[in-house]
Amino acid sequence: WPASVLLHAAETAPFKIKKDNRLKVGIVWSGSVTFGGNAKRAVGLDRFLQLAAAVPEARFFSFQKGPGEDELRRHGSYPLIHVGNLFDDFSATAAAIRQMDLLVMTDTSLVHLCGIFGVPVVDLLNYLPYWLYGTEASTTPLYNSVSFLRQRRPGDWDDVFERVAQILISLAGKKQERPNMGARDILTQIRNSLGVRLELTETPSPPSRHKAALK
């Protein structure tokens, strides 16, 4: 567990993205509003609109679902590309996230799906996050592809987004130089930015042509 869980990605993604040398970033800014701690772990759409403006060399795809989509309808999504309304199950979602170079999100269940399928993700954590992630580490032994950016002070998202912007600016530049960067290359760059050595562990993979492994 968790890589041994038998999850399968759909054979065909619910949308296709033209390949180019721009970094593809999936985003989510809020989890389930029925979760008691969601107000502390979630942010507003405006945070990610500012992030997209700070990294114009990247393309940002909204995987947001639920009430968070109302913000898109009220304020408009530009320059984000909203794809969260194109899939409704984990299989289709898994196929969709595999088209991204990485995802940047506040803590939601999608982090676990990214981890299972080896998709690089930067999980933005509030000061006292889900107990499973501890209080200090930038990585977790549960998933090779998950990295954490944590609040250094309670409620301070400004610092978190400044740091993730610097990571994405660096990644976008690397992607311009090397359009064929794979998940492992992306993850290595993220870990370098965090000052963490990349150490991949051997874990069993789902018996599917869409394996939960970094390639």
Q: Model segments located where?
A:
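Catalytic machinery of carbohydrate-active enzymes
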Residues: 1-190, 210
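Boundary detector for helix-to-coil junctions that initiate low-complexity/charged tails
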Residues: 181-215
